[in-house]
Amino acid sequence: MPLDKVLQEIQQKGEEEVRRIREETEKEVEKILAEAKAEAEEILKKAREEAEKEAEAIRRQEISSVKLEMKRELLNVQKEILEEVFNLLRQKVRDMDEETRKKILKNLLEKNASPGMVVYSRKEDEDIVKELIKELKLDVTYGGNIDCIGGVILEDPAGDIRLNLTFDELVSQVYEQKLSEVSKLLFK
């Protein structure tokens, strides 16, 4: 066999081998690229799902925060309204007519004053209270003035027992007892 033919045959086999390797490499590269593309798509899909979940969680959290803030604002407004109602009630009690005031003071003294007690009232009610002490023939002394919207404080001589029967205290007690009813009437 001549050398040219052998060289030609080797060259031909080499070219076929190169072609075969190139085809296998191209197939392998295509396979790797397809797998990489599929993996990238899967990673992208998972990242997108995670981002959507995170966005949804943030949205829910923001909605929850807004709802909480709205509820807080509503409660603040309701509290302000209840305080205004309480202040109006105090004002109404402070401004009650003298006849009604006298009846209430008389009732408080009759039912609660014990012999030897000291009675305190607001300056504006001093004359009425002194008059009632005489009228009811109570064995008590008038002790002076206190800062309140009305009513009396009764104290034993030693100062150990003190009955706060001021309108301030009575209004507060009634208001606290009726607060849920007032709230229902105003806000339901």
Swiss-Prot record:
InterPro entries registered for this protein in UniProt: ATPase_E_C, ATPase_V1_Esu
Signal peptide: none
Superkingdom per UniProt: Archaea
Recorded GO MF terms: ATP binding; proton-transporting ATP synthase activity, rotational mechanism; proton-transporting ATPase activity, rotational mechanism
Subcellular localization, as worded in the UniProt entry: Cell membrane
Keywords: ATP synthesis, Cell membrane, Hydrogen ion transport, Ion transport, Membrane, Transport
Classification via NCBIfam families: PRK02292.1
HAMAP family, A to Z: ATP_synth_E_arch (MF_00311)
Membrane topology label: Peripheral membrane protein
Function: Component of the A-type ATP synthase that produces ATP from ADP in the presence of a proton gradient across the membrane.
Protein family according to the UniProt entry: Belongs to the V-ATPase E subunit family.
Gene of this entry: atpE
One cellular component term from this protein's GO annotations in UniProt: plasma membrane
SUPFAM superfamilies the record matches: V-type ATPase subunit E-like
Subunit comment: Has multiple subunits with at least A(3), B(3), C, D, E, F, H, I and proteolipid K(x).
Gene Ontology biological process terms, A to Z: proton motive force-driven plasma membrane ATP synthesis
The protein, known as: A-type ATP synthase subunit E
